[in-house]
Amino acid sequence: MNQLIYRLISKRKRISPHIEKFEFDIGIFIVSIWVVEKNNQYFLIDSGLAKLLPRMAEYVVRNFYDKERVSGVILTHGHSDHIGGIPRLKTLLPNLPIVIDSREIPFVSGEKPYPGREKLEPITFKKQDFIELGTPESNELLEQAGLKAIHSPGHSPGHTCYYHAEDNLLIGGDLLTTNRVGVLNAPMKEYTADMLKALETAHSVLKEYSQAILSVAPGGEVKNAFQEMEKSEWFQNS
């Protein structure tokens, strides 16, 4: 494993008392992995790229955490820049549970492409590789991590945000984006299945969690995200 590449493009940030974020700057956008700590256990939210740099999650675990205390991966959705690190991570931790919304299964299993796309994802899995959100096993894992799942469709059918109540932080995945100076923006159009639905969902979620800090994958952290969204031109003109 060529760790130098991963070290050069990554930044480790503590974004709240119990959550760290690893940002991998690949030039065209930022790929993020969050690590939530509770009771000396660690839970990854998303896992990084598939083909270009498939060892992002493995790099994070090997270099910064005791792998025996890594207790699960919880996915925001199944696009390849979020799910791509799973195979390499599973070579390190073969029995690691992986949680995803059931509405993502047809796309991550290669049954069909995501809405608006012609090609299947560059990496596919078996349905049994995952624990579906809403099952007793996934509920237990979320409780252990101190997280609440929030279905947030639009970017993808089963896109899910995760709210950490103790830290009042909303892990948004690709709910929205920020630019490189932290200004809130719409989801990336070319990767979003239904932009109007995505914006409607984001507005609803941010209204409900208006006091929370928003952390997004392609970008950074935003305070007062609901107010920022409401006054933005991209939302007002949508």
Label the model's feature ranges.
Residues 6-62, 161-178:
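Conserved beta-strand hairpin/beta-sheet module of binuclear metal-dependent hydrolase folds
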Residues 24-25, 131, 151-153:
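Short Gly/Pro-enriched turn/cap motifs at secondary-structure boundaries
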Residues 43-45, 74, 98, 169-171, ...:
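Residue-level marker for buried hydrophobic side chains located in beta-strands
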Residues 50-51, 148-153, 157-231:
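Metallo-beta-lactamase
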Residues 51-54, 61-139:
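Active-site HxH/HxHxD metal-binding segment of metal-dependent hydrolases
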Residues 68, 96-97, 145-147, 212:
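A structural micro-motif
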Residues 114-119, 189, 232-234:
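Short, hinge-like loop/turn segments at secondary-structure boundaries
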